[in-house]
Amino acid sequence: MSKTILTADDSASMRQVVSQTLRNAGYQVVEAVDGRDALAKLSISAPHMLITDLNMPNMDGIELIRQVRALPNCKYIPIVMLTTESQDARKQEGRAAGASGWIVKPFRPEQLVLVAKKLLP
């Protein structure tokens, strides 16, 4: 059985790139358009991993991470921020919320796959 990764990003083109990259690597992908949509999908089924953008409407990535970490069935899943933000203060905020890692856009597809393989052995 392949592992499922939930991706949250308000950019349709970015969701497409991330999903295609992960599907080509053998993962199942569920897409969410923002943090609120991601939480709704998490209430249906817990993924093995979450990849989220930082800046999204309705609920940003930091708040999404905080809320995901409060869910008993998602408390320990790996969460990776995939964002244009690269400032140390933002990374610290992400870590404090519960992010497992941080990838800065633009990214190389193989970089995303390597991170997924590392966090989902």
Give each language-model segment a name.
Residues 46-48, 73-78:
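His-Asp phosphorelay/catalytic-motif detector in bacterial-type signaling
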Residues 107-116:
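C-terminal output helix
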Residues 56:
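Receiver (REC) domain active-site loop signature in two-component systems and cognate sites
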Residues 31-49, 92:
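Acidic, metal-coordinating helix/loop segments flanking the phosphotransfer/catalytic sites
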Residues 16-24:
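Charged docking surfaces used in two-component/phosphorelay signaling
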Residues 53, 83:
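Active-site residues of response regulator receiver
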